[in-house]
Curated annotation (Swiss-Prot):
InterPro entries: NA-bd_OB-fold, Ribosomal_uS17, Ribosomal_uS17_bact/chlr, Ribosomal_uS17_CS. This is Small ribosomal subunit protein uS17. PANTHER family: 40S RIBOSOMAL PROTEIN S11 FAMILY MEMBER, SMALL RIBOSOMAL SUBUNIT PROTEIN US17M. It holds the Pfam family Ribosomal_S17. Belongs to the universal ribosomal protein uS17 family. The keyword RNA-binding applies. GO terms for biological process: translation. The keyword S-adenosyl-L-methionine does not apply. GO terms for cellular component: cytosolic small ribosomal subunit. GO terms for molecular function: rRNA binding; structural constituent of ribosome. It comes from Paraburkholderia xenovorans (strain LB400). One of the primary rRNA binding proteins, it binds specifically to the 5'-end of 16S ribosomal RNA. Part of the 30S ribosomal subunit. Keywords: Ribonucleoprotein, Ribosomal protein, RNA-binding, rRNA-binding.
Amino acid sequence: MNDSVKTSLKRTLVGKVVSNKMDKTVTVLVEHRVKHPIYGKYVVRSKKYHAHDDANTYNEGDLVEIQETRPISKTKAWVVARLVEAARVI
């Protein structure tokens, strides 16, 4: 038998939680840098994703990793996989 470790083929992204006002849902802002095709300057592009947070544990400012999953609702097809870094409380 072959004892190989299964790896997840689902996409994962890292972003910042910008809203946790919905029940069991967080809004995650994912930013990435893209080089402008003509000018060559690096520009920051961003997109917001709704991710499933079953226990309502993540707060605004947390850095989280989200993973693609089956559609949970009309706008939600991602689930929070893990907490990368907690938000600083001042």
